[in-house]
Amino acid sequence: MDTSIDEKRLEQIIKFLNSLDINSKRFVEIINQKDKLILHTFNEALTHSSANKIVNYEKLEFFGDAVLRLSASDFIERTYNSMSVGTRSELRSQIVSDEWLTELGKKIFIENVIIKGPKAMGDENSKDTIIAETSEALILSLIHISEPTRPY
């Protein structure tokens, strides 16, 4: 895997990650040491397929969606285990929704660091979807820091 990222993009990613204000020793180490492999994963998470057909967020978004749904299911099971399965499923769909992910992405200004191709840049109809999908990919990248042996 090519882990080369130009210096300007590297600094943009680091500045963005610092803005998240994550207080984790491992996270701070990665940022301070400019761990190229991990930062490449963040670059991938923040790149739309219209900009790069090979290095983009699609795989991370796919796994991110699964991890979020599993985490939400686990939380709901532990917290609201007396609810019917149908009600728990409805609650999960509210917790892990494109609307929530878009709101999260907007709150952290993720759109400022997403690399998009010209077609996606001009497509206002897919703007929120891209923000939601990128947020999922970012979440998985953050999880990858704490569990780097995972296959994603």
PLM regions with names:
Residues 74-79, 107, 141-142:
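Active-site catalytic microenvironments for nucleophilic, acid-base chemistry
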Residues 144-152:
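Single conserved hydrophobic/aromatic residue that forms the stacking wall/gate
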Residues 55-96:
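Active/ligand-binding-proximal structured segments within catalytic/core domains
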Residues 129-143:
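Acidic, Mg2+-coordinating catalytic module of metal-dependent nucleases/exonucleases
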Residues 90, 97-116:
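Alpha-helical ds-nucleic-acid-binding substructure associated with the helix-hairpin-helix region
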Residues 1-55, 104, 108-110:
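Extended, intrinsically disordered, low-complexity regulatory regions
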Residues 110-131:
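Histidine/acidic-rich helix-loop-helix segments that form or flank divalent-metal centers
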